[in-house]
Amino acid sequence: MFVFQIETSDGMNTPQYIGSLNTVSEIDWYHHCSTNSTAVNDLFTGQMVDMRLCDACLRVAVSTQLFHILPVPIAEPYPLHGLVSLEACLAQFAQIELMGGANGLVCDHCNRLRLLSDRSSRPDPAVVVTPIGNHITPLSPISGGSDLMNDSIGRETQQRTSTPIQSRPQPSTSLVLTDCRRRSLIGYLPSCLVIQLMRFSAGPGRQSTKLCLPVVIPLNRLDMSLYVLHNVDPAGAGLSEPSEDFYNLYAVCLHLGSDSTNNGHYVTYARCADDVWYCFDDDQVRAVNIEYELTTRLVRQNAYLLFYERAF
């Protein structure tokens, strides 16, 4: 993971901001490619760029994260037909998210300023007037001191995952949480893109729950260009340059039954070398019409992992 901080920014779509993000993304990606050259990395590894803009000081924390599986939240269904499009899920993944309160940002810069302000406002022990019998010497301890300089703004980045995890630990009471805007985009797309639909979340009592909303899965020409960092237009008027980031589906993994990933049954639909789609259900294998299967309630409500390959 690579962590970087942009000193000031007027927003998340300014030319300075986008240009700096592209530089950070390229440095991290070229370093990864120069030190990792395997078939798995060449085919399945991509890069995600996570940005957090502090609303108080307008500094941007940037972190990069390599991925083999891209976790994507499930969007709200369309009111008319109750279906969810995969494109809507990807758009929700890439949208700017407002965060505050307990989910706010531990901004290194803001906390450093607060620490310096506290220290400057603290009375000098050498000149404090104290009652007789309670004389302060240079060796007397000073209460209330704390060192926040080791906290990094980049440490706030959490890996996205569909697997239920424990709630985020609350920061020390001496730290200040600031409101922020968060956005995640894709720095580099892999040749083989694996999308994980985030169907599982932690419920009351740490029990996981499964979201069975029906997701419409494109078979061909899934356009990923809208979610790639170097395609973001600083003016907000669309793509800054043409892109050819289309993907075709070659496999789908379903999770059936349980509300937990630890249990349940997995079924896979895959396109084989003969260009025929098959359903793999334990020891049972049968040829299927994938265009029909993708319209069924079984597939739409239980699709968990989607396997796409770049279209050439």
Question: Where do the model's predicted regions map?
Answer:
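Exposed substrate/partner-binding surface patches
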Residues: 26, 30-34, 58-312
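Papain-like cysteine protease catalytic cores
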Residues: 1-66
